[in-house]
Amino acid sequence: MHPSESIWGTKSKSLAGKKIILGVTGSIAAVESLELARELIRHGAQVRAVMTPESLKIITQHTMEFATGQPVITNIGGQVEHVSLLGDFPDRADLLLIAPCTANTISKIAAGIDDTPVTTMATTAVGSGVPIMIAPAMHISMYRHPIVQKNIKTLTEYGIEFIDPYIEGKKAKLASVEEITERVIRRLGPRDFLGKRILIIGGSSAEPIDDMRIITNRGTGETAVQIALAAFERSADVELWMGRSSVTIPEFIRTKRFETLADLLEMVGEIDQDIVLVPAALSDYTVEKTEGKIPSDKEELVLHLRRAPKVLESIRKKKCVLFGFKAESSVTADELVARARSRMIEFELDGIVANDLREVSKGTTKVTIMTKKGTICTVAGSKKEVAHRILDEVLRYIT
């Protein structure tokens, strides 16, 4: 067994059954191609690498053969690899991904020049209608060249999708492996949320006691991030509003931050999305803030808490499909369902996701999902798997 087989599908099966041709060109970012290939495999893809002569000066074909477990194409020969892999045949590849892609290769593809294995693959893919994604990487002066920008626009008009580089100093750096992978999943996925605008509100709010101390809830923000990623993968227009959190938020997910409940309530007026999900750990109580810092040598400190307004009430005034979340602790399954249903009725929610905190551990969870239409189901698994199941129920509700 080749080592690449041991990592297949270990993160998800989102790309299971998908064949991806990975074009590698002569950018120093070619060193990232090994990890990119393996990340695609971890999500279930079969990857075949195609390399230009210039890329072979940076990494070897043996490197990419190890990464993919497949023979690497460095020349087009009697097997007419460009036709057999990307021609007009039923078993052709599902995607040509060129990452990294140089200014030279971008311009050649735009001009219909195919004098390298990668550009020949691109010419064939364009002619046969195979999707193409390009992730540029180069010096910023090259990326800003008006002819390069014109060629990018031309290729975009042909339906080729560009994964924008990160601009850092004088470099247009290759997008992260995570972003490229997520965008590939989005392109090849079910696209069942295409045209839908989804807002996810996550993390925890924090109410200031003084200039130093706060009252907050426990919450990592992981569930919100996983739902945002799942919606992104399914072609939704996603926005994430995040309070305090301890997880990394992907840079390619459009994000706004809030601190206090008052901050969030002020933002509610901006909501114009079709669907809103609120897996946030929001404060139930607020406290009147003391200016400065309360002395730490006091033997006793009394705080007067007052009930906080419910954000769901404000959001409900918007014309959107609204799913709330309800966390309980140490309750029976029947009690969990009863309390969740009561919350759903109280705030006129379209659906609610409930869980017992005892069922939550790092990376995994168990939830019960119910909707106003009377559907109810309980699902368990990784937070990524559960995020997709939540979206399945949202889709079932709106269709």
Give the ranges of each region predicted by the language model.
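A cross-family phosphate/adenosyl-ligand binding-site feature
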Residues: 1-399
